Amino acid sequence: MSQILEMCAEQLYQSEQKLKPIAPIRSELGEDATVDDAYVIQDINTERALNSGRRLVGRKIGLTSVAVQKQLGVDSPDFGMLFADMAYGDGEAIPPGKLIQPKVEAEIA
């Protein structure tokens, strides 16, 4: 399985580098894939980013709504890494050429 995880990490890395979307990797992971497998893939690419000089500045928490968790068949929030080159200040323009499929999500408190 570790070879498959490495291959999936490489596909995601190349997608980010080339700013080109790829098909979901879940079919390559197989039905036995776990959330832990997904975090291994994330760890591989986090290590790669840190080794290339990117600076980790925080984390992005997702799936915080129980309703959304149920919709997606999970039972807890997930998280991803936020690097300095991904963070923008209030009112700062975000260059669209740096994003693969830009979207906006409202966070209502």
Show the residue positions of the predicted features.
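Active-site microenvironments in enzyme catalytic cores
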Residues: 2-109
